[in-house]
Amino acid sequence: EYIHGEEKGDIAAIEKKIELLEKKDGEEGAGERSLKEKFTGAVIVGDSITEGFTEYDILNTSSVVAKIGVHLDELDEQIKQVKKLSPGIIFLSLGMNDVEHTNGDADEFVKQYGAVVDELKKSVPGAHIFVNAIFPVQEKAVKEKPVFAEIENFNEKLKELCDKTRTAFIDSSDLT
């Protein structure tokens, strides 16, 4: 009798109830999942900052491809490793070492970063790639290495590259 009554009911109202229940289920489940679970199928490629995700047991080693001090023109092995993992999502957290390595040349930096993005798109064609902005540094670091004053300019160029290559850009400058 209940089923027959519902069959005659407003379909839009029933769909709305289902949608609300699914949303509630999603919210409840999302809070219980660890970062390790949330990053299953994703990989972060980066340098020493990225390596901290495994050092401090935040993410599984299968979600992190990192090397301390790595430069954009030295990523062949990391790209091979990412290809083997074949993730659906790739986060790139690179560039801090390259601000100094390129002597503050943002155009050279973008050229090298673009080559990395292109190679990853070829190596893992179905993956969604997200490029993280270079984190800003404290004024103390700028005084020690004035080239770090160019980070904002590097990030602007990086965003332009992402727009041009249709790659997602994550501006993390407000997080620090």
Question: PLM features: residue spans?
Answer:
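Alpha/beta-hydrolase-fold catalytic nucleophile elbow
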Residues: 93, 132-133
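Conserved SGNH/GDSL esterase-like catalytic core that processes O-acyl groups on lipids
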Residues: 26-114
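Extracellular glycan-modifying ectodomains
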Residues: 1, 52, 97-98, 123, ...
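A short helix->loop->beta-strand "cap" motif at the edges of active sites that frequently abuts
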Residues: 124-128
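Substrate-gating cap/lid alpha-helix
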Residues: 138-172
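N-terminal secretory targeting modules
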Residues: 1-39, 55
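Charged helix-capping and loop-helix junction motifs
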Residues: 106-116, 147-154
